[in-house]
Amino acid sequence: MGQTPTIAINHLGCEKNRIDSEHMLGLLVEAGYQVDANEELADYVIVNTCSFIQDARQESVRTLVELAEAKKKIVISGCLAQHFQEQLLEEIPEAVAVVGTGDYQNIVDIIRRTEQGQRVKAISPNPSFIADENLPRYRTTNEAIAYLRVAEGCDYRCAFCIIPQLRGKQRSRPIESIVAEAEQLASQGVKELILISQITTNYGLDLYGEPKLAELLQALGKVDIPWIRIHYAYPTGLTPKVIEAIRDTPNVLPYLDLPLQHSHPDILRAMNRPWQGQVNDDIITRLKTALPDAVLRTTFIVGFPGETEEHFGHLLDFVQRHQFDHVGVFTFSPEEGTAAFDLPNAVPEEVMGDRRDRLMALQQPISAQKNAACLGQTLDVLIEQENPSTGEFIGRSTRFAPEVDGLVYVKGNANLNEIVPVVITATDDYDLYGMTAEEAKVF
């Protein structure tokens, strides 16, 4: 074989997909392939696709079409490949391979087979693989941040969600494996570790016979990483034991990402989340009592089939009452293969859009008020970027998760990828502004 081809990866979708991309990069680099961020210079482009909702599929398809027009050899991986492998091979001649969500660990063999002229379909119908600390990984986040997958797949069957069909049943990693990877990441200079899975509060249920998130957090408390953040916590899994572990483990942030989806029992029942409607209020109250400094992020779906103005009004009241720090709102997207796909009483697009806008308009002053409460405080900020034209630094406090929440704009001297104390001097609806505590002493 002559010179090895150059390969680029285009990552789309969620952070679970990002980790898959990082493992593929790590495997390819270890095998001697050249990796380039510039797709124009690459011989192959791996597009790690998303198929969660219609907008994500459209973005994936647009990317594939653009690369096909550029005559690139395309390897399609991820959820779209798992979902529509036959259609993709039929409609995109430039696709030399499709790779399922449980097959990315074989990427080196797949590329070698395509180099020999084969067109490869590597799709496990029931994905069962989960990467551990021994699989090479080439991180694509900045030096100080890493995502750590504690489990893959999902055993729940929410009516709107296709993910269990695309990523398989839940399979958790042993606590020892997760801690070993966290230690590796700490040695690489990681300052913030974000724990992810489909339902992080269910971690360990398949492996140990009961959820073990509390024990995992306690074990990670011994790792030298200052910030550990939990994403995708199912509300009913926030038991007193888990809340206690969050409270008592110093490097676990009191930040919780809770995908509540709705508040009204009728809609939650239709979503196949019936038990949640009985406990939403109690769990949030219990959280705020046990963790007074807790930062709560949530997401909601508006326009689920059958959602009336009364149901939506219940959601508005719920958001007003609980004063979440951060809220994301999605309009319902009917996904073929899910229980909600052909439900009656569809909500018109314009009504869904109006409800999304009304909910975000309700949340905006709440977010602004939460930020305003930080005025005059000194907050720890992880410095991530520098604006060379202004000399200003950009980072995040513990209140803000990467990419989904706000930023902190910082004046003064600081080092990238370090956590520094910052005095907050101004706020707006979504961001904070300040100067390093050292700079503030000058004034």
UniProtKB/Swiss-Prot annotation:
Pfam families: Radical_SAM (PF04055), TRAM_2 (PF18693), UPF0004 (PF00919). Induction: Part of the rimO-crhR operon; upon a cold shift from 30 to 20 degrees Celsius, expression increases to a peak at 20 minutes, then decreases. In a crhR deletion, mRNA rises to high level and remains high for at least 2 hours; de novo transcription is wild-type, suggesting CrhR is involved in wild-type regulation of mRNA levels. The rimO-crhR transcript is processed between the 2 genes by RNase E (rne). InterPro entries: Elp3/MiaA/NifB-like_rSAM, Methylthiotransferase, Methylthiotransferase_CS, Methylthiotransferase_N, Methylthiotransferase_N_sf, NA-bd_OB-fold, Ribosomal_uS12_MeSTrfase_RimO, rSAM. Its cofactor is [4Fe-4S] cluster. Its EC number is 2.8.4.4. Residues 372-438 form the TRAM domain. Belongs to the methylthiotransferase family. RimO subfamily. Catalyzes the methylthiolation of an aspartic acid residue of ribosomal protein uS12. This is Ribosomal protein uS12 methylthiotransferase RimO. The lineage of its organism: Bacteria, Bacillati, Cyanobacteriota, Cyanophyceae, Synechococcales.
